Amino acid sequence: MKKILALALTLALTLTAAAACAETLTMATNASFPPYEYVEGDQVVGIDPEIAAAVCEKMGYELEIVDTEFDSLISGVASGKYDFVMAGMTVTEERKQMVSFSNTYATGVQVIIVKEDSPITSVDDLLADGANYTVGTQNATTGYIYAMGDIEDAGKGTVAAFPNGNEAVMALVNGKIDCVIIDNEPAKAYVEANEGLKILDSTYVVEDYAACFAKDNTELVEKFNAALEELTADGTIPAIIEKYIPAE
């Protein structure tokens, strides 16, 4: 009996020590992008934090989340300051030059928010020859990149970049800009929270979301992708997305 108790105690101590020594991965995000990431109380919550937690648990890691400015995410993970980034991050060829991406876990749609009485009724109005609107975006996002190319560089208006989506929407509410280009899901949250705004029916851009890592961190990317595949197959990740974005 003493030998059995001693063995059980040794096993318990070993498991406890293993849990205590579990390595922590740091995920950076910009928590102003509901429902993918946002602050609730003193916690960063949303689709990305929940998927990251599930993936880290599957890989055997603890998870730490750092909330920082969106335009510092790529440089931060590329330099090794963070282990990975999940922030509704769109996969682009330009970003692929600086970081490695995981497999895609969600699809995003860029839309346009306007005031209900806006003369802008479609994407075509915004991109028409002779158009001269001021368009708000979040700095360093794909919405900003697309708008610069389609609108400002094409001489069809001006692009105003803001630190986050909320500030862009507040500028629209206060009449400082004519519209906001942003992803569909946070757009829904902003329109619901601010009377007098609407989302145009026409889609601006469709894009893929993925986690990103330092270019040389191939081992972690492979582990992440393997866990992502398992959690997608067993329904965990679809359930997380469905929790925040119910199927219509």
Q: What function would you assign to each model-found segment?
A:
Residues 61-62, 78-87, 131-134, 164, ...:
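Alpha-to-beta junction loops
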